[in-house]
Amino acid sequence: MLLLKKYLGLILGLAAIAMIYIIWQETAKITGEVSAAGSTSAAVALSGARVTLYEMTGEQEQRISAALANLQEQSQQEKADNARVYSAESKDEMTRSNLASFNNLSDTKHCFALEKVLDEIRKSAVRKETTDSQGHFGFRALPGRYVLEIVGQPNGQYVLFVEQVDPKWHTHFKLAEPTCHYSLTN
């Protein structure tokens, strides 16, 4: 009993340190898996993609959110305009090919405009890594405002995922629909 009293403070101190360490290991963990449409249109793990976590201010977050929404709207409008000019249901192979080419051009313009928006925060990268063979990635970050950028080139495609992150406890992403993509071949 006397021995227990003597070491009780030490035992409680070590227990507190262990709890702090365990909680720290689980807090603000950002993990995810990324896939993109393959040549058969089935989702394929995006292995070897560059994953970057950028820290940003509240003002930057608002500007980027507004710019992303605006760019997405412009891209959809261009595709709608293309569909009015070149019918997807056309029997003519040339017409369908022209529609695909113009849509790819719209996607390419959208991606380049998105890259320009992201240039504002590129100097604030806090973590970088690549996805493994199953498309998995993971970071540990302090609480704050972040943007997650994932860039890959599967099957002759350029794909870019942009996600805003506000890590709380353990944030897990399952990304399959890129923010923008285009064909590198025509």
Protein language model annotation of sequence segments:
Residues 32, 131-139:
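Glycine-centered loop-to-beta-strand initiation motif
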Residues 130, 151-180, 186:
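Structured interaction patches on ligand/partner-binding surfaces of diverse proteins
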Residues 61-77, 81-83, 109-134:
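Short, acidic Ser/Thr/Gly-rich low-complexity loop/linker segments typical of extracellular
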Residues 40-47:
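A short beta-turn/strand-edge loop motif at beta-sheet boundaries
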Residues 135, 143-154:
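A short, solvent-exposed beta-strand micro-motif common in secreted/extracellular proteins
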Residues 8-22:
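Hydrophobic membrane-insertion alpha-helices, especially the h-region
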Residues 47-76, 81-102:
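Extended low-complexity, serine/threonine- and proline-enriched intrinsically disordered segments
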Residues 30-38, 51:
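A short, amphipathic beta-strand motif
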